[in-house]
């Protein structure tokens, strides 16, 4: 059993991004990410601060827009339009969740697809499902980078993705399918789930339930990717996988914390760099 080290892989990605950003700066371009935070959600504030810190560490520009929770949808859309038209901005990220009075889909669709570094716009979703080049959501993209780094051959592999969200489950399935894997998409209500997961060589779990996947649900030698991050009443941070029981059966497994998590911000930086390069070519 080998534990996948997301921290070291993310550090490699960030080092590459930093070197590329320095090169772009020499031609007068600073890859820049604009982040919009609406409200005072503590978790969102933490995420936004970590994104800002990561940008600066990688020699990238960071523009923060902190709006009150009373901000109207029209005000938010107006800000997005300003950022869409600003040539100094390469990536636009709206931190989720948004207050209930704002239509999340309407906001995400307002972002210029060429600056949609989260990969949530319908244009980028369509490109991914069609196997075309666009922006891919950062968490599944980070998982693909981990699998590549650990030399996992996806051609013909039986893979199960547990979770059907637009942020992880669906794009993860598309990426694996595009890479030649044979895909099953399951979720917390799938019948006979253990039978399905035991047939798989690769299991990706993203259901948001602590210790959801147990040892009886995986085959010997399986590769298990845990996307979950859950805080127990005790304060302990755990994933969707019962790590202690599942890990001994695996050939590869991601821990929580330190597995998939660090890759998400690394790939956000990578997507922002990609946008800056694309925009430079189109000048």
UniProtKB/Swiss-Prot annotation:
Taxonomic superkingdom: Bacteria
Annotated residues for binding of NADP(+): 163-165, 188, 229
Gene Ontology CC terms: cytosol
A biological process term (GO) from this entry: purine nucleotide biosynthetic process
Reactions that this protein is recorded to catalyse: (6R)-5,10-methylene-5,6,7,8-tetrahydrofolate + NADP(+) = (6R)-5,10-methenyltetrahydrofolate + NADPH; (6R)-5,10-methenyltetrahydrofolate + H2O = (6R)-10-formyltetrahydrofolate + H(+)
Biological or metabolic pathway of the protein: One-carbon metabolism; tetrahydrofolate interconversion
Signal peptide boundaries: none
Any one Gene Ontology molecular-function term assigned to this protein's record: methylenetetrahydrofolate dehydrogenase (NADP+) activity
One Pfam family it belongs to: THF_DHG_CYH_C
Keyword terms of this UniProt record: Amino-acid biosynthesis, Histidine biosynthesis, Hydrolase, Methionine biosynthesis, Multifunctional enzyme, NADP, One-carbon metabolism, Oxidoreductase, Purine biosynthesis
Gene3D superfamilies listed in its UniProt record: Leucine Dehydrogenase, chain A, domain 1 (3.40.50.10860), NAD(P)-binding Rossmann-like Domain (3.40.50.720)
Enzyme Commission identifier(s): 1.5.1.5, 3.5.4.9
Quaternary state and interactors: Homodimer.
NCBIfam families: PRK10792.1, PRK14186.1, PRK14191.1
Main function: Catalyzes the oxidation of 5,10-methylenetetrahydrofolate to 5,10-methenyltetrahydrofolate and then the hydrolysis of 5,10-methenyltetrahydrofolate to 10-formyltetrahydrofolate.
Family: Belongs to the tetrahydrofolate dehydrogenase/cyclohydrolase family.
Protein name: Bifunctional protein FolD
